[in-house]
UniProtKB/Swiss-Prot annotation:
Its EC number is 2.4.99.28. It catalyses: [GlcNAc-(1->4)-Mur2Ac(oyl-L-Ala-gamma-D-Glu-L-Lys-D-Ala-D-Ala)](n)-di-trans,octa-cis-undecaprenyl diphosphate + beta-D-GlcNAc-(1->4)-Mur2Ac(oyl-L-Ala-gamma-D-Glu-L-Lys-D-Ala-D-Ala)-di-trans,octa-cis-undecaprenyl diphosphate = [GlcNAc-(1->4)-Mur2Ac(oyl-L-Ala-gamma-D-Glu-L-Lys-D-Ala-D-Ala)](n+1)-di-trans,octa-cis-undecaprenyl diphosphate + di-trans,octa-cis-undecaprenyl diphosphate + H(+). GO terms for biological process: cell division; regulation of cell shape. It comes from Cyanophora paradoxa. Belongs to the SEDS family. This is Putative peptidoglycan glycosyltransferase FtsW. It is found in: Plastid, Cyanelle membrane. Could play a role in cyanelle division/peptidoglycan biosynthesis. It comes from the Eukaryota. Pfam families: FTSW_RODA_SPOVE. PROSITE patterns: FTSW_RODA_SPOVE. One of its GO terms (molecular function) is lipid-linked peptidoglycan transporter activity. InterPro entries: Cell_cycle_FtsW-rel_CS, FtsW/RodA.
Length: 397
């Protein structure tokens, strides 16, 4: 009981501190452009902030027990996430000051910089290997994951190329297709099948949105599936994820343990949940409960009602962005909106599908909920493009 009291007190203090600091940041970055912007832009902006803040509150609860057990600090993981939150808010608000056409003009710079970092992760003396995967580079005590950070700039660069595809020379087209392929293969080699698949699917769907001929799209599907099958056949742990997904109860204490515990966690929530901060499964039963499987802990604490409410919020967010895209006349900017929302929704829905046993374990985080500073930064930058698009839609229409 004393431990529970300590955890709850620390959580309450953290929430108070969090909102005070966020309020100060918003006051600093609240600029006049939002005072006269469309209702769509305002609503999209505040929905993004709500998603972010609510996700951080869920993370405080989901990570509290493990933080105390491993570091004797209930807020250890939250504090680290909060640092990235502040950095992300600053960067995203700065980016929202600039027209998307300007960001597209100079998108090559961050894209190739992070592209280079992705290649460096494969170098033995530079890339850091964790659990057999070489995906990180250490920078001042923080682990930088280029495959996460490149996601928003992946959208910008694809939009820039695909949006003016018919005006490009054959040589330029081949060059960029090779660059995109190298990026996907580099992530696949790390190995990181889930992120490589996400980048590939985003590329394919943006090609679909750009009205690429079906003969090219179907050809890339064959190439993508071949790469995925090859990766799975060469990496036994990826194959075991699929076999354990098909029948997790066959080996509930072995390969199926993660999914079985996730389903138990979700079932424990019932209709209304156990209450915020009172999850039992996060106390050592459900592995990676504050990262890839945080959605299961969320359902345990908020129940079926909470799960449906979150899903409705995400659907509303999606429809709001679609409305903005339909109001956008500029073809390249429309592609930016399509790519950004595709990236956000695929990660969200796949993470939920994995936690509920609908899809094999992927390793994709739940945007704004899962612990991971690199993913948080990428998602905030990605959403800043959507908000900026909503701002510009009013001006252009």
């Amino acid at each position: 009981m004393q431990l529970l009291y300590t955890i709850l007190k620390e959580i309450a203090d953290a929430i108070l501190f969090f909102f005070i600091q966020v309020f100060k940041i918003f006051r600093y970055f609240f600029y006049p452009e939002f005072k006269n912007c469309s209702k769509l832009a305002t609503l999209l902006r505040w929905l993004t902030h709500f998603w972010l803040f609510f996700g951080l509150m869920v993370l405080i609860s989901a990570s509290g027990f493990t933080s105390y057990e491993e570091h004797r600090d209930v807020l250890y993981y939250f504090k680290r996430q909060f640092v990235f939150c502040l950095i992300g808010i600053v960067i995203s608000n700065i980016l929202m000051h600039f027209p998307l056409t300007l960001l597209l003009k100079y998108s090559n710079i961050p894209f190739f910089f992070i592209f280079g970092l992705t290649i460096l992760t494969l170098m033995p003396n530079i890339g850091i290997s964790i659990n057999g995967a070489r995906r990180w580079i250490a920078v001042y005590g923080f682990l930088v994951q280029p495959s996460e950070l490149i996601k928003p700039f992946w959208v910008l660069q694809i939009s820039k190329i695909f949006g003016q595809w018919e005006f490009l020379t054959t040589r330029t087209k081949i060059f960029w297709l090779i660059i995109f392929l190298i990026q996907i293969v580099a992530v696949l080699i790390q190995p990181n099948l889930s992120t490589a698949s996400l980048l590939g699917i985003t590329l394919w769907l943006m090609g679909l949105c750009a009205n690429f001929p079906w003969k090219y799209l179907l050809g890339t599907v064959f190439v993508g599936l071949s790469m995925a099958i090859t990766s799975i056949s060469l990496k036994p742990y990826q194959l075991s994820r699929i076999t354990s997904f098909l029948d997790p109860w066959k080996d509930p204490r072995g390969k199926g343990y993660q999914l079985v515990q996730s389903l138990i966690t979700i079932g424990s929530g019932g209709i209304f949940g156990t209450g915020y901060g009172i999850s039992l499964q996060k106390t050592g039963y459900l592995p990676i409960h504050y990262t890839d499987f945080i959605f299961a802990v969320y359902i345990e604490e908020f129940g079926f009602i909470g799960a449906v409410s979150l899903l409705l919020l995400i659907i509303f967010y999606f429809l709001l962005v679609i409305t903005v895209i339909l109001k956008t006349n500029h073809p390249v900017l429309r592609l930016v909106g399509c790519g950004a929302i595709i990236l956000l929704m695929i990660q969200t829905l796949l993470n939920m599908a994995v936690a509920t046993g609908i899809f094999p374990t992927t390793g994709l985080p739940l945007p704004f909920f899962s612990y991971g500073g690199n993913a948080l930064l990428a998602n905030l930058i990605n959403c800043s493009f959507l908000i900026r698009l909503a701002l510009e839609t009013k001006d252009r229409n």
